[in-house]
Amino acid sequence: MYGDTLLRSQFGKPSGLLFGPLPCLLCLGCFCLVSPSGLRAGPAEPHTSTDWRLKPSLKYDALCLLNAMSGDPYYLRYYQAEYDHFHPLFTPEELAAFQTLKHIIKDEGGGIVSATLALYYSVVDDETLPEIIRTARDSSAMEAALRKTSYWSNEGWRNYERAKPALQTALQALNRTGFPAYWKQTAQPRIERRIAQLSPDLPKYNIVPVIESYLGFPLPSQTVTVYLLAYSEPHGIRITGLRFLTHVSYPFQIVLHNAIHESMHPPYHADEPAMRQAIDLLSRDSLIVDKVKRHDPAFGYNTPSGYIEEDSVQALEQIVSERFGVERDARKYWQQQDGGMHVLAAAIYVEYKRSLSQVPQEYTKWFVHAVEDGYLRGDRLQTIVKEFFSEESLREAK
């Protein structure tokens, strides 16, 4: 419905290849498995190039704006003006619907309203608000499509079903009060300008083959689709396929980091027995339990498995970024990001990078052994984290 730009990475190979030629990647086998991309897939070949597609989306902007329309202070920091514009136009019933959405998905479910709904709606082709409302009224097609992905959760779907009446009312409220016209006038032109600014540089980064070399399996596509949004801040959100949502204001480096990061969710097959056992074992570690329990739930990562996945991806993001010369100051970043909760990412980064310098191997294989052998648990984990964030290390990094 809205214009998009497709670009291909044809150059810009990263320096310092750790693996040399791309390794033989893990075959998904003859069974009907769920790939980490979220799509059910059979065997696939590794990719050699990266296509970049940049798009605006009224659909995802509408779903992201639901965060702020509930009056959630966490999002009003970013969208007070939009809240002030629409809030007086809503009826009491509509205002209650926005708050009910937040209560069910965020307060009770421990999720993020925008991330949850964007993921679910990414499995259907809706683009306009009337289409989105129709799916909220009858979500059978969404359910059938979502069941075919690795993102399906019985509990998550039950929460969505509970939230559906409020979602329908909230979306109808946005439609009734003129959100589509508001978006086209205030958001779309800004997004189109930003797409034109980003387009020359993204093709320099051929990220897909490099990511695959660490994950050990092919991504679902060589096309990375970036939806630039006006109302997604402060999140970067992965949806099904090799697609993600990022904010129009983010500088180039953050957009690139978002692309690297979100393309790796999830970085392993969590349903494989060895990986499942390793995740369960690490989930019981006292440091992991403490970080999940004692952080602002608005950040997300409210379960041990979700926290482990996120920190795995953050560590891999740093390693991949170093290959392209666009890495962050890792110590400073993890000291500040989400209140400093991602200490596991720091430990994974240190230990996996050390292992790669000796015997290059796929992340899944390394992770399972690191957890089972105690390199990523207990006193050893505590020591790695303490040394990484020590005053001496911080001084050396400056």
Identify what each model region corresponds to:
Residues 1-19:
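N-terminal secretory signal peptides that target proteins for export/translocation
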Residues 20-35:
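Bacterial N-terminal signal peptides
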Residues 42-138, 340-352, 357-364:
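N-terminal mature-domain "stem" immediately C-terminal to a signal peptide or N-terminal signal-anchor/transmembrane
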Residues 182-238:
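Auxiliary, metal-adjacent structural segments of Zn-dependent hydrolase domains
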Residues 254-274:
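Active-site recognition of the HExxH zinc-binding catalytic motif
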Residues 270-297:
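Post-HEXXH active-site segment of zinc metalloproteases
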Residues 315-398:
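Pan-zinc metallopeptidase signature
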